[in-house]
C-alpha cells in the first residue's frame, strides 16, 4: 500500500523559521527538505507546528505544491521554550483534529519529530487509528548525561520519550550510535528501530572554488567557520580557546585567521551564551580575529562553507550533525568532536578530523594541520564531497517511504482483521 498523505508533526519549531535562531537548526532543515521531496513524488504533506506569531496564516503553501505548513494554536503566540510548550499540547492536539475534520482529511501515517510531537502523535493515533513513525532528533537521556537541559525537567521528557517508543510503529534513528542509545538507555524493541540518516540538498551544497567564494564574501584570511545555535551544548568557546592556543604558540598562523560564527540573535545582546562568548573573546584579546555574524539566510551558506578552510563542529552532543554534512557536500573539511552522530558522519583523517570533546588543545592541533597542509586539506575536501553523495535527499526519502508504506499496509491489514 502506497501512502498518499502524511501528517508531519513539528510542534515546537517551524520548518519555515530562520535558521540559527532560538531552537532552530537541523530538525527544521530536515522537516522542510523531507516535505519538499515527498511533495515532488505527489505525496501530500501537512506539517503541523505551533503558532508563534498571531500574524501567521493558518495555512502556508509556500513550501512546495503538495506540502503545507499548518499553524496551530498552542499557548500564547510567541516563542516558548520546549518545556513551556508541554502544558499546551492538548490544545495543539485539538487544533490538529479540528483542522483534519474541517478539511475532510484522512492521513495514512503520522511522522512526528521530537518528544513533544510524539505525545501529540499518540493522541491523534487514538482518534485516527493510524501508525506513528517517530524521530527523536535528540534524546533526553543523552542531554541529561552530559549535564545539558536539567532545568528543563528531563524526567518529564525522558518519561514521555519512553512512552513514545512503546506507542510508535517505527522509530527512525539517525545513526547506529542513536540506535544503540535507544536500546541501552530506553530498552527499546530493536525490531521497531530503523537507521535512516538525514539527507543533504546536493543542488544547493556543492563545491565552489574557494577563492571565488572568498572574493564574493570579501574575505581575505583563512576562514574558520561555525554554523549553528549559540548555546553551551555547541561548545563554541572551545574554538575560541583553540585559537588562543594557536596564537600563543604560532602567532603568525593565528594572525592570518578569521573565525566567523553564524547563528544567534544579534538583536538580543543579552542572550546569555552570546554575551559569555563575546566576553571570552574580549578577555583573550581576540576581537580582531573573531566575528559574530548572527543568523544568515540559508541561500548564503554554500558561499560561507566554500570560503572556509575548515568548518568546526565542537559540540558536546549531536544526534547527527547537519552542518557537518552540508560542509562536506561543499567540499570543506570538518573538524568535529568525536561524539554521537558526528563520530559516525565525519571520517577521521579521511573527510576531516575527529577530536575529543572539550579538548581545546586537540582542536588547535587539527586547525593548525588544516592551515599548514594545503594538499591534505584538498584531499579531505575531495573525499568529503564523495561521501556526501550517499546522503542525497532522494535516496534518503526512498528509505523513508518504504517504512511509511510498510507501517501503513500493516495498519490497514489489522483494521480488516478486526
Q: What is each stretch, according to the model?
A:
Residues 1-69:
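N-terminal subdomain of nucleotide-sugar transferases
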Residues 177, 199:
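Carbohydrate-associated surface elements
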Residues 218-234, 240-243, 260:
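Conserved donor-binding/catalytic core segment of Leloir-type glycosyltransferases
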Residues 295-296, 303-308:
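Short alpha-helical donor nucleotide-sugar binding micro-motif in glycosyltransferases
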Residues 316:
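Aromatic "clamp/platform" in nucleotide-sugar-dependent glycosyltransferases that forms part
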Residues 333-336, 346:
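Short hydrophobic beta-strand element within catalytic cores of glycosyltransferases
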Residues 348-349, 353-360, 369-374:
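Conserved acidic donor-binding segment of nucleotide-sugar-dependent glycosyltransferases
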Amino acid at each position: 500500500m502506497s501512502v498518499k498523505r502524511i501528517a508531519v508533526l513539528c510542534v515546537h519549531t517551524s520548518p519555515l523559521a530562520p535558521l540559527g535562531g532560538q531552537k532552530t537548526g537541523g530538525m527544521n532543515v530536515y522537516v522542510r527538505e523531507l516535505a519538499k521531496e515527498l511533495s515532488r513524488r505527489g505525496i501530500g504533506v501537512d506539517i503541523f507546528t505551533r503558532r508563534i506569531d498571531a500574524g501567521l496564516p493558518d495555512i502556508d503553501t509556500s513550501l512546495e505544491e503538495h506540502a503545507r505548513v499548518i499553524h496551530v494554536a498552542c499557548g500564547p503566540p510567541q516563542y516558548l521554550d520546549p518545556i513551556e510548550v508541554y502544558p499546551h499540547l492538548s490544545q495543539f492536539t485539538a487544533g490538529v483534529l479540528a483542522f483534519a475534520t474541517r478539511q475532510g482529511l484522512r492521513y495514512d501515517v503520522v511522522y512526528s519529530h521530537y518528544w513533544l510531537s510524539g505525545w501529540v502523535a499518540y493522541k491523534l493515533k487514538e482518534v485516527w487509528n493510524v501508525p506513528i513513525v517517530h524521530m527523536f532528533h535528540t534524546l533526553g537521556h543523552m542531554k541529561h548525561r552530559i549535564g545539558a537541559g536539567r532545568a528543563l525537567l528531563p524526567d518529564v521528557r525522558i518519561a514521555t520519550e519512553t512512552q513514545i517508543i512503546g506507542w510508535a510503529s517505527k522509530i527512525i534513528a539517525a545513526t547506529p550510535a542513536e540506535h544503540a542509545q535507544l536500546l541501552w538507555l530506553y530498552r527499546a524493541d530493536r525490531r521497531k528501530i530503523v537507521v535512516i540518516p538525514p539527507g543533504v540538498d546536493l543542488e544547493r551544497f556543492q563545491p565552489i572554488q574557494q577563492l571565488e567564494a572568498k572574493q564574493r564574501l570579501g574575505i581575505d584570511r583563512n576562514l574558520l567557520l561555525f554554523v549553528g545555535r549559540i548555546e553551551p551544548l555547541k561548545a563554541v568557546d572551545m574554538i575560541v580557546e583553540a585559537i588562543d592556543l594557536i596564537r600563543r604558540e604560532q602567532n603568525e598562523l593565528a594572525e592570518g585567521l578569521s573565525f566567523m560564527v553564524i547563528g544567534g540573535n544579534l538583536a538580543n545582546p543579552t542572550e546569555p551564551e552570546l554575551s559569555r562568548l563575546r566576553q571570552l573573546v574580549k578577555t583573550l584579546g581576540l576581537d580582531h580575529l573573531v566575528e559574530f555574524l548572527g543568523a544568515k539566510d540559508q541561500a548564503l551558506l554554500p558561499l560561507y562553507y566554500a570560503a572556509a578552510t575548515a568548518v568546526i563542529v565542537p559540540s558536546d552532543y549531536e544526534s547527527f550533525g547537519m552542518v557537518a554534512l552540508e560542509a562536506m557536500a561543499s567540499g570543506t573539511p570538518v573538524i568535529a568532536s568525536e561524539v554521537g552522530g558526528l563520530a559516525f558522519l565525519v571520517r577521521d583523517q579521511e573527510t576531516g578530523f575527529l577530536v575529543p570533546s572539550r579538548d581545546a588543545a586537540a582542536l588547535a592541533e587539527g586547525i593548525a594541520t588544516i592551515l599548514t597542509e594545503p594538499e591534505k586539506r584538498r584531499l579531505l575536501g575531495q573525499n568529503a564531497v564523495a561521501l556526501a553523495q550517499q546522503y542525497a535527499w532522494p535516496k534518503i526519502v526512498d528509505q523513508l517511504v518504504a517504512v511509511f508504506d510498510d507501517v501503513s499496509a500493516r495498519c490497514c491489514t489489522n483494521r480488516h482483521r478486526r
